[in-house]
Curated annotation (Swiss-Prot):
Keyword Cell membrane: yes
Catalytic activity: fluoride(in) = fluoride(out)
The gene coding this protein: fluC2
Chain sites annotated for binding Na(+): 76, 79
Protein's UniProt name: Fluoride-specific ion channel FluC 2
Amino acid sequence: MSSTYKDLDKIFLIGAGGFLGAICRFSLCELMESYYGTLSVNVLGSFMLGLIMYDTEYIGFIGPKGKLAFGTGFMGAFTTFSTFAVQSFTMPFFPALENISVNLFLALVGVFMGRSTIKALSGREV
């Protein structure tokens, strides 16, 4: 198979994952107010990306194609740094500071929890 076809395969996987991730983000944000919807997708996305990245490194259940589809495609479209930035920019100073602090802290906690889950499942030091 030529490299062009391999690249098309990767592009399709990322695009399909992105399509589903965008739909899921839209659906979840429609259920909540904008601030809470954005916070929810970013924290959930950080947890899920933590699972995906550490799984591909230590367990291998997802595999390279799954990492492209779910890690790059789905999570790239599901999470939304730009919406978080615009929402923070348009808020008064102290609510914006709270929004920034809560988003960053909980996103890092999400990655930590994803990593901890993989560590527990693999039985290895991660």
